[in-house]
Amino acid sequence: MDGVTVIDHPLVQHKLTIMRRKETSTGSFRRLLREISTLLCYEVTRDLELTMETIETPLQTIESPILEGKKLVFASILRAGNGLLEGMLDLVPSARVSHIGVYRDHETLQPVEYYFKAPEDVAERLIIVVDPMLATGNSSIAAIDKLKERGAHNIRFLCLLAAPEGIRNFRAAHPDVPVFTAAIDSHLNEKGYIVPGLGDAGDRMYGTK
């Protein structure tokens, strides 16, 4: 699928299978989400640009590669996005963080925005937007709309699961934003849930209904 990368690393797929199981506990689900987010972050950042820096090791002075440019921004779509955020910050602790409050109205399936906080200079940074589920795509589309209104243009979207319907909607709205996911599932049901999916990621992560 054009513009979509499926991260099929064996460890990612193994952990995802355990997360899908309905008997997986809240604590285990949360831990696995943190672990899998680190692996996903590794893949979504593999082409970051490097520059050479002169450093001193205990033995000699050398030229060594280091990330070039301003720090990344991880933009979490609340609340479930925070589950991915933690593992990514373990890997890139210097990243800046944006929080975007968008929830899906369960009657209309449309996004409702309630919060937005991001660094002022998002136009100068790579933004990685995170949300475990790309279902209808409406929430992620709305979140990226807000970032673009602030001048952001170098954006990537990272999720755990995606539905074909959500991918189509997302790519139609933001064809310039690549999507990274661990799996593309079959379809959405009448309630807008990904099938076979893993249920509501936020509820499973926080033990709510």
From Swiss-Prot:
It holds the Pfam family UPRTase. It comes from the Bacteria. Pathway: Pyrimidine metabolism; UMP biosynthesis via salvage pathway; UMP from uracil: step 1/1. The keyword Ribonucleoprotein does not apply. One of its GO terms (molecular function) is GTP binding. SUPFAM superfamilies: PRTase-like. Disulfide bonds: none annotated. 5-phospho-alpha-D-ribose 1-diphosphate binds at residues 79, 104, 131-139, 200. Uracil binds at residues 194, 199-201. Binds 1 Mg(2+) ion per subunit. The magnesium is bound as Mg-PRPP. Keywords: Allosteric enzyme, Glycosyltransferase, GTP-binding, Magnesium, Nucleotide-binding, Transferase. Its EC number is 2.4.2.9. Its cofactor is Mg(2+). It catalyses: UMP + diphosphate = 5-phospho-alpha-D-ribose 1-diphosphate + uracil. Allosterically activated by GTP. The keyword rRNA-binding does not apply. GO terms for biological process: UMP salvage; uracil salvage. Belongs to the UPRTase family. Catalyzes the conversion of uracil and 5-phospho-alpha-D-ribose 1-diphosphate (PRPP) to UMP and diphosphate. This is Uracil phosphoribosyltransferase.
